[in-house]
Amino acid sequence: MNIKKIAIPVVLSVVALGLGFWVAGKLFDPGTGSRDQQVTPEGLQGYMLSPARKIAVPTLVKGNGSSFTGNDVKGHWTAMFFGYTNCPDICPTTMAVLVQAKKQAATQGVEFPEVVFVSVDPERDKVEMLGEYVGYFDKDFTGVTGDSKLIDALARQMSVVYMRVPSVTDDPDNYQVDHSAGILLLNPEGKLTAFLTAPHTPTGIVDSIQAIINHTPPA
């Protein structure tokens, strides 16, 4: 697969066509139907949930062919991003920013989460293709795909929005997927803890992660 190198802009000024995680002040837990309480520690570009939201992670498939389960988001912080390999701009740019953020975090001594890229286009994002795509950015990043109903269920739990945009050509497979542009942070218990909002920058991500960790009581 040939993936063009992505130049990282100083500021990533893209939002997925208005699709976000929530309408300000109205983020609901789909499991309970109750409104989430939000806090914004200094330095965080986004919101934290108080308390963190329990997530039932379904069994999906990693880019290397092995199973991805709830155990894969426990014991460490996780940064989860929903996208797809045919995404023309938001996905490759966000992944490239995450690569730079990881490097910056290492120089600053900041714990960086494990990155998980969840495909919102499982019909086209086959396992091997997804593994190659994600591995292009960082071999330690994890690509995840699987049954569309299971991905839908995971996305709903995490307040992620996405929808297929029909092709404007004669090729029905030449479609795009509009999707949320934010990054989700799960704590070492596997609970949804925070939303990092676009536009993303390496410094913004690192500062946000540090703010979240500092604001989270030790287990």
Task: Enumerate the predicted regions with their spans.
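Short loop/turn microsegments at loop-to-beta-strand junctions
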Residues: 55-56, 78, 180-181
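N-terminal targeting signals for export/organelle localization
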Residues: 1-56
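Thiol/disulfide oxidoreductase modules built on the thioredoxin-like
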Residues: 150-208
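Structural microenvironment flanking redox-active thiols in thiol-disulfide oxidoreductases
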Residues: 93-154
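Short active-site neighborhood of thiol/selenol oxidoreductases, capturing the structured segment around
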Residues: 68-94, 98
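Periplasmic c-type cytochrome electron-transfer domains
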Residues: 33-38, 142-152, 179-183
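Hydrophobic beta-strand positions
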Residues: 59-60, 185
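Short, ordered coil/turn segments that flank beta-strands lining enzyme active or ligand-binding pockets
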Residues: 63-64, 188
